[in-house]
């Protein structure tokens, strides 16, 4: 049974609490700088949310549009979690720790504010993601994006030792795996609507009625 059949979503419902609790007791600007990539990096939560929430419009069925809406919205919740982690790791910094842990360059521009950049300080850019308007191309990118996000969280877990940080990072990592599986289900849904002899004879997001508008005269089910 597919994910969206198992769970009923309510659109535009917002709880004034994090999806997963973040309660960090001690500041650590070095760790904050590492985790920053999941705010504004190429494989981070901001990139993921914008990717899915923009790709959804061209998806061929309401079910798949709904799935991308749900996952894109959840990625915004994950962005809140990561931002809370970074903020709590830096809110009680001592001035001498800034240079000691290499956080001084970020501090000059943003103090302890949250700015979308990666661990190297490169600002977020929309060029990190693509919206192709083709269900196969976009869902393939989505599956790869979730694996890259999972790998990034794996790398973070290799570098941090604070249990208060490890706990929410593990949660986020697990959600990336779930999202990967859901996008795989969406891919199979697209395939089920097409001629199994060749899925790629038309663009299922654009060629609504395969016929004169379809360059290869394929057949939708």
What is the predicted role of each segment?
Residues 2-221:
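Non-heme di-metal
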């Amino acid at each position: 049974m597919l994910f969206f059949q198992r769970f009923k979503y309510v659109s535009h419902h917002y709880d004034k609490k994090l999806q997963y609790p973040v309660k960090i007791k001690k500041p650590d600007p070095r760790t904050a700088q590492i985790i920053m990539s999941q705010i504004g990096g190429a494989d981070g939560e901001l990139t993921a949310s914008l990717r899915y929430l923009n790709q959804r419009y061209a998806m061929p069925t309401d079910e798949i549009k709904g799935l991308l809406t749900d996952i894109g919205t959840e990625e915004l919740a994950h962005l809140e979690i990561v931002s809370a982690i970074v903020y709590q790791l830096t809110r009680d910094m001592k001035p001498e720790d800034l240079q000691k842990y290499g956080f001084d360059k970020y501090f000059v521009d943003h103090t302890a504010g949250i700015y979308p950049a990666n661990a190297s300080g490169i600002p977020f850019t929309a060029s990190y993601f693509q919206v192709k308007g083709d269900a196969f191309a976009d869902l393939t990118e989505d599956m790869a994006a979730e694996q890259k996000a999972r790998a990034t969280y794996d790398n973070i877990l290799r570098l941090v030792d604070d249990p208060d940080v490890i706990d929410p990072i593990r949660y986020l990592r697990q959600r990336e795996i779930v999202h990967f599986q859901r996008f795989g289900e969406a891919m199979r849904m697209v395939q089920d609507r097409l001629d199994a002899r060749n899925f790629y004879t038309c663009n299922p997001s654009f060629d609504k009625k395969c016929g004169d508008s379809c360059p290869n005269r394929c057949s939708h089910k």
